[in-house]
């Protein structure tokens, strides 16, 4: 169970970090365009 939890956390971070990074860039781009 612990391994599954760690794998879930690792996967979540692996997905969320790049997504958040792209989201920040997108927001900045929209703000500059507007």
Swiss-Prot record:
Coiled-coil parts of chain: none
Domain of life: Eukaryota
Keywords recorded for this protein, A-Z: Chloroplast, Membrane, Photosynthesis, Photosystem II, Plastid, Reaction center, Thylakoid, Transmembrane, Transmembrane helix
Key word Thylakoid present: yes
Classification via InterPro entries: PSII_PsbM, PSII_PsbM_sf
GO cellular component, one term: chloroplast thylakoid membrane
Topology in membrane: Single-pass membrane protein
Stored NCBIfam families: PS_II_psbM
UniProt function note: One of the components of the core complex of photosystem II (PSII). PSII is a light-driven water:plastoquinone oxidoreductase that uses light energy to abstract electrons from H(2)O, generating O(2) and a proton gradient subsequently used for ATP formation. It consists of a core antenna complex that captures photons, and an electron transfer chain that converts photonic excitation into a charge separation. This subunit is found at the monomer-monomer interface.
Protein's UniProt name: Photosystem II reaction center protein M
Species assigned in the record: Morus indica
Lineage of producing organism: Eukaryota, Viridiplantae, Streptophyta, Embryophyta, Tracheophyta
Annotated gene: psbM
């Amino acid at each position: 169970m612990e391994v599954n939890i760690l794998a879930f956390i690792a996967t979540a971070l692996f997905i969320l970090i790049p997504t958040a990074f792209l989201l920040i860039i997108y927001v900045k781009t929209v703000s500059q365009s507007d």
